């Protein structure tokens, strides 16, 4: 197993890294993303990780692996000095078994026309792991980046401290 990466060593401006780590996201009794199923016999579809100083990686998921029927465009946008203008989607979940129907506002985002350095993630999706029922990366359950504002994915492969963690107010 590789040594964990220290997020303090990640670059600023952030770096885009390709990965073949499998991703599965479940919410409300549904699968929102499954890169293994989408990849079929060829193996999991590749993902992108954005790695930035003091942030766990934010993962960008290929549209082919997403259950797009659960997404609706949402009002509002935000701007990242590195990636550009982000558009949001609400996650609209129908009732399934014991899971009631619900809408999670702005739970997913994407950059439709990112800056040149981040062109590979154009149209790909990122999400807030803390809003999902379960998120797995390379078979490991993901923890959300603290604070609710950021969309980083914490696994045993990254070591903090992480921006947004109230235990490290100098990073907030």
Tell where the protein language model's regions lie, with residue ranges.
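Terminal leader/tail segments of proteins
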Residues: 1-172
């Amino acid at each position: 197993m590789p040594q964990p990466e220290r997020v303090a060593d990640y670059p600023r401006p952030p770096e885009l890294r390709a990965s073949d780590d499998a991703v599965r996201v479940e919410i409300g009794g549904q699968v929102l993303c499954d890169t293994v199923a989408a990849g079929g016999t060829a193996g999991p579809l590749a993902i992108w990780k954005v790695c930035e100083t003091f942030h766990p990686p934010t993962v960008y998921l290929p549209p082919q692996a997403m259950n797009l029927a659960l997404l609706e465009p949402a009002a509002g946008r935000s701007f990242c000095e590195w990636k550009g203008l982000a558009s949001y989607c609400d996650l609209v979940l129908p009732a399934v078994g014991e899971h009631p129907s619900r809408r999670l506002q702005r739970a997913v985002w994407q950059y439709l026309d990112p800056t040149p350095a981040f062109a590979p993630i154009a149209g790909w999706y990122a999400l807030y792991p803390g809003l999902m029922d379960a998120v797995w990366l390379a078979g490991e359950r993901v923890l959300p980046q603290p604070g609710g504002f950021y969309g980083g994915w914490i696994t045993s492969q990254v070591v903090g401290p992480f921006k947004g963690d109230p235990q490290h107010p100098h990073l907030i």
